[in-house]
Amino acid sequence: MFELIFLGTSASVPSHDRNHPGLLVQAGGQRILVDCGEGIQRQLLASGAGFRRLDRILLTHGHLDHVLGIPGLFSTLRLRRSADVMSVHGSPGTIDVVIRMLAGLWGDGRAPIPLELVPLTPGQVLDAGAFTINCFAVRHRDTDSFGFEFVSPARRHLLPERLAALAVPDGPIRKTLADGYPVTLDDGRIVTPEDVLGTPGGGKKLVIVGDTETTDGLQAHVRGADLLVIEATFLQRDSATARDYGHLTAAEAAALAASGNVGQLVLNHISGRYPDEEILAEARSIFPATRIASDFDRLTV
């Protein structure tokens, strides 16, 4: 299960109601920040999530509206005397932006907190314990951008009726079966996992795409996602302008969701030039299971 807290949902210019981009994903005891726009500290506090115990930051790309919150966040963590190592993941170009930004404030090779900078490559898979994060390339103007597939595996659960029928006692022996290993009961009978486990279920797939100028190449990554979060900066009537600035229209985002058999579509990176109702109408005409993200929205998948 993944819990999402939308911290910033604006396009490059923030508004009264929308902060610069940032999204917190919580799952399996992990707290992962996707993008770190200006003002992210206050958004974390206002959301109730807080900014301590962040496990890592994933950056979709290095444009300033997605990374300018990093220095302030790191400075506050230093004041809080955080000893945890912060891992920041992004493309080589994005990591270079972070390095230069930190160097301008604290000097070459220095940072205010323990820091691990991790350049990403397309196809790289990050192990987050209870789930994995597949990193894939995204096209957005002059950047080497990334999208992220969060995948929790389907699991088989113990069937109470089978446990009772086979007289399997409570305790560690049941955990052994749940972990996939056979056990021997006190009376000598051998019980295997196949005897007491149900069919696989419960696996989830969350896909997050930041700024992108095309849906080409994204189909394989979004296919079958329970939830797709993706930008929709323009409407289709302004598709030429969308191309010029390297962004999608709401119609294009919806078409991608429809072709990928996505469960739910959440539109993000919202421009103040359009009423939300108009953006939503364009997308829902193609993919009805669409909503627009707002700051401090919480979703669970």
Swiss-Prot record:
SMART domains: Lactamase_B. It catalyses: Endonucleolytic cleavage of RNA, removing extra 3' nucleotides from tRNA precursor, generating 3' termini of tRNAs. A 3'-hydroxy group is left at the tRNA terminus and a 5'-phosphoryl group is left at the trailer molecule. GO terms for molecular function: 3'-tRNA processing endoribonuclease activity; zinc ion binding. InterPro entries: Metallo-B-lactamas, RibonucZ/Hydroxyglut_hydro, RNase_Z/BN. SUPFAM superfamilies: Metallo-hydrolase/oxidoreductase. Keywords: Endonuclease, Hydrolase, Metal-binding, Nuclease, tRNA processing, Zinc. It is an enzyme of class 3 (hydrolase). The keyword Glycosyltransferase does not apply. Zn(2+) 2 binds at D65, H66, D211, H269. Its cofactor is Zn(2+). The keyword Hydrolase applies. This is Ribonuclease Z. The gene is rnz.
